[in-house]
Amino acid sequence: IARNISWETKSDTPTEFGVNIRTPKDFSEVNGYEMKYYKTDKLGLLPKAVLELKNLRNEYKVKMKESESKSEYVKWNNNQLAVKRLMASFYGIVAYQGFGWADVDLAASITASAREAIRIAAFKVREL
């Protein structure tokens, strides 16, 4: 969501939402750059869908916590877990070549931005 990664937001012009798809999978130095950029003017379809699902999941979690019976709790918990899995599957469908809208750049950008976030957090923990 943070990088606005989506089919229609891809940009050949550098923007503030750049992703280095060569971000290492470990703690080694960044060795080279291959940037993919995404437009910042309008929220893309993919992040918009994820945000809507995230809001729906949060609604289900509130209902789950407010449940007055075990069966109601289980129902809302199952609903929020289903939405969680649906959100997580978006990367898989974008990366799957059998999907009509598969896009290697989007899949690479999603995984690279996740690696970058994990690396930043890990480096901060090391500093403690």
Q: Where in the sequence are the language-model features?
A:
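Conserved acidic
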Residues: 1-128
